[in-house]
Structure formats: structure tokens, C-alpha cells
């Protein structure tokens, strides 16, 4: 389980990050643990929601640190649920200051150059070929149909098995979108956890049958 925010360091005391709290990943980690699964929760250092108990915990800072942590897992997981709010952009240059420790406001204005950051979700299929891979699509703009379309695009682009769609565009609750584009609506986090455990159980049964 990945959750919470990543960050990009501007200098030794400032960061570019987001408002993710780690709540959904924490709640789902606890639910899967209660369901009998061995859970490792990778939480962004900036997570503010209380950490789950009874599960393995690893913290991460940047996109790269999460990637390294995932690749160092000692065994292949049955499921990867990637809900971490990673940085969409990385800092490639800062003009106007040479300081790495703390940029002084006395130096005047600075210009921060950003470029798109590599995504982790598209790499997960190669890293974990046998795992059920669940991504996350949080959409603010548009209607529910737009959010679902974005989720479908994610499934096609990343090779993941499931996409959980939510946000203002989707509306209340969560949508579980499968590769066949079937959609299951979950009213709350508890029903989402139960639905994901059901999907995992069916996937395990199908895999063992082969």
C-alpha cells in the first residue's frame, strides 16, 4: 500500500508538495490487515493521518525514494495499491540563487524550472508481474463520465488491473474500474476496502487454478 505525499526539495528547508494526508491508504491498510493479509504501508513523510497499527510501515520522501523502497521488497506481493500522491513535476534548475541550504529572500526573485516527473504506476507491471495492481485517479475537473474516462485511460497506459476513481469530478464515493471497463460504485471507504479484498480473493483463486 502506498499513500501520502511525496515532495521535491527547493532547498534545505523548503519543499514543493501537496495536501495528501495518507488517510485512504491508512484505512485500507488496517482493513486488509484485519482481513488476514500481511500488509506493508509505504507512507509519505508528510502524512498527517495517524499511522495504522499492526502493519509494516516504511516512510518515503521523494518519488525516487518510493520507487527504491518498492523495488527492495523481499518478495513478490499479491497486490500493489498505489494511492500515494506523488510529484507530477521535478525541479531541474533554480535561477537566482546558488544556495543549497536556504535561499535568502534578500537575494530577490528566483525562478524554479520544472519538468514532468517519471511515473511509478507504469513501472509496477514490470517490477511485479504476478501482482494485482490497483491505481488511483483523483479528478477535480469535469463530470463523473470525465473521471471514469481518465481512469480508463490510466488502465490502458499503465497495464494496471484496477483503477479507483474519486474526487470532485466523480462525486460522492469511489468507483472501482476494471480492465473490461466495468464500474463498481462504493459509497464509503469501508465498502471500498471490502470490494478490493473481494477482487483480490478472486484473483488469488484464479491464479491458483492455473
Please report, for each region that a protein language model flagged, where it lies by residue.
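A cross-family phosphate/adenosyl-ligand binding-site feature
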Residues: 2-210
Amino acid at each position: 500500500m502506498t499513500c501520502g505525499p511525496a515532495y521535491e526539495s527547493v532547498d534545505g528547508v523548503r519543499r514543493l508538495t501537496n495536501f495528501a494526508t495518507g488517510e485512504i491508504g491508512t484505512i485500507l491498510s488496517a482493513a486488509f490487515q484485519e482481513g488476514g493479509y500481511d500488509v506493508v504501508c509505504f507512507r509519505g513523510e508528510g502524512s498527517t493521518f495517524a499511522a495504522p497499527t499492526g502493519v509494516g510501515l516504511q516512510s518515503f520522501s521523494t518519488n525516487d525514494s518510493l520507487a527504491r523502497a518498492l523495488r527492495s521488497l523481499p518478495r513478490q506481493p499479491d497486490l500493489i495499491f498505489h494511492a500515494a500522491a506523488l510529484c507530477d513535476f521535478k525541479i531541474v534548475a533554480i535561477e537566482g540563487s546558488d544556495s543549497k541550504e536556504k535561499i535568502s529572500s534578500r537575494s530577490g526573485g528566483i525562478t524554479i524550472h520544472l519538468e514532468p516527473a517519471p511515473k511509478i504506476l507504469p513501472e509496477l507491471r514490470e517490477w511485479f508481474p504476478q501482482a494485482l495492481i490497483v491505481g488511483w485517479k483523483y479528478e477535480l475537473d469535469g463530470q463523473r463520465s470525465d473521471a471514469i474516462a481518465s481512469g480508463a485511460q490510466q488502465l490502458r497506459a499503465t497495464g494496471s488491473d484496477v483503477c479507483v476513481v474519486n474526487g470532485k469530478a466523480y462525486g460522492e464515493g469511489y468507483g472501482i474500474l476494471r480492465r473490461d471497463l466495468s464500474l463498481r460504485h462504493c459509497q464509503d471507504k469501508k465498502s471500498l476496502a471490502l470490494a478490493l479484498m473481494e477482487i483480490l480473493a478472486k484473483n488469488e483463486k484464479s491464479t491458483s487454478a492455473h
